[in-house]
Design a protein with these regions (language model features):
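N-terminal juxtadomain amphipathic helix
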Residues: 1-74, 238
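A conserved beta-strand element that flanks and buttresses the S-adenosyl-L-methionine
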Residues: 160-163
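Flexible, glycine-/basic-rich loop-and-beta segments that form/coincide
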Residues: 243-289
């Protein structure tokens, strides 16, 4: 495989086997047409970048019915409100210009609708962009790229902040992304983005962060090296609790900003923990294999003991777990979810029925596999009755 930034040849260090599209929830009639790919991961030692070998076409992924709305999570709504307040305090002033990449249903940008900030969101999924527009959030239904910004002259070289959250790892052509940012940012403008953190994935063995839409897993070291190639520099970082451990990166034009000491401290820490080294990748591979065996054996014992098991939350991440561990309806009876686009369909590859959360409440199992472990606090507070009636939670990561 080739590094998607440097074009160097890199050797995959691990295969997760045959995988379907992570968000490819489907009807029974479509089982026979389901497609799979061999999901392998590699590591560029030149720029310390963890990356996927193959990925789905973003135009297909973000088609009309992309099944995720940010506003469905109270936790994320709170997080984005705090994110908006922080950006306003640190980087915006009266009449500043702001663009969000992958703005979803407008949950983040809604915080700017009553300000004098000149903002705009880019959202490629039509149904989600339409929802943002219904929420009176200014949104362009398009991918954020060089071709789609040509008519936005008032933002060219005048944008104070370009931001994104859990989006950049989904974009295969980072070069085009950075060139687009370069055209829009003012001389002292900043690009701020949040993504799940490689170090957190390694420490938790949360391999379900890897699927066809998550093309990259970033570290502070890799972000620094990538942007240096394009005359930008990493000027600040902030660790976040979201998604099991994420990092907020702040990037600016070279020599236009003071670089915060936290960047240097994180790079020293990553070097100490060998996040910039293939050795950590091979250790992660070993830990994944151990985790897989533990999941299979634990669930098998539960079934042998007569336990009823369901899945909670039909996440994209669950597709990796279910297919990597070869789980299906022999083990998991159903998966409950609140997303209407998924209910009545089946999980990709494993073909477990997706049912509404009300079905979970009416048919409380003995064990619930929490696939949305990164939202555990919000879910635990909603599902106290499950525990009170003797149920227990299970996951491949520590809860």
């Amino acid at each position: 495989m080739k590094c998607k930034i440097t074009n160097e040849q890199i050797k995959p260090f691990m295969s997760f086997g045959k995988m379907p599209a992570a968000n490819g929830f489907l009807k029974e009639k479509d089982f026979k047409n389901e497609t799979f790919y061999n999901m392998e991961v590699g590591f560029s030692e030149k720029i310390s970048l963890f990356q996927l070998n193959k990925f789905s076409n973003p135009k297909i992924i973000h088609s009309t019915n992309y099944p995720f709305y940010t506003a469905s999570s109270e936790h994320m709504k709170t997080h984005f409100k705090k994110y908006a307040i922080w950006i306003q305090k640190e980087y915006l002033k009266s009449n500043s210009k702001l663009i969000e990449v992958g703005s979803n249903d407008g949950t983040f940008l809604k915080n700017f609708t009553t300000t004098n900030i000149d903002y705009l969101g880019f959202e490629p999924s039509k149904t989600i962009a339409d929802q943002a527009s219904k929420n009176n959030v200014k949104t362009v239904n398009a991918f954020f790229n060089d071709a789609n910004i040509q008519n936005l002259k008032k933002f060219h070289n005048k944008t104070d902040v370009i931001c994104a959250a859990n989006v950049i790892a989904h974009i295969p052509d980072l070069k085009n992304l950075i060139h687009t940012i370069e055209k829009l940012l003012s001389q002292k403008g900043v690009f701020i983005f949040e993504e799940p953190y490689l170090g957190s994935m390694f420490s938790k063995t949360s391999y379900d962060q890897i699927y066809d839409e998550h093309i990259f897993m970033f570290s502070v070291t890799s972000v620094k090296k990538i942007f240096q190639l394009f005359d930008f520099e990493l000027i600040d970082v902030h660790w976040q609790k979201t998604h099991g451990g994420s990092m907020r990166y702040v990037v600016g034009r070279r020599n236009k900003h003071k670089v915060n000491d936290t960047v240097h401290k994180w790079i020293i820490n990553e070097n100490k923990n060998k996040l910039d080294d293939m050795e950590s990748c091979l250790e992660f591979k070993k830990n994944c294999e151990t985790s897989k065996a533990k999941v299979i054996n634990s669930l098998k014992k539960m079934k042998n003991d007569g336990k009823n098991i369901c899945g909670y939350a039909a996440t994209a991440k669950s597709t990796t777990v279910l297919n990597y561990c070869n789980l299906n309806t022999d083990t998991i009876d159903f998966i409950c979810d609140s997303t209407k686009e998924k209910i009545g369909k089946f999980s990709p590859g494993s073909h477990i029925p997706i049912v509404p959360v009300s079905h979970f409440h009416k048919n409380l199992p003995d064990v619930a596999y929490l696939f949305a472990w990164n939202h555990k606090d919000e879910i635990f507070s909603k599902e106290k009755e499950f525990l009170n009636k003797g149920g227990s939670w299970f996951s491949h990561v520590s809860l």
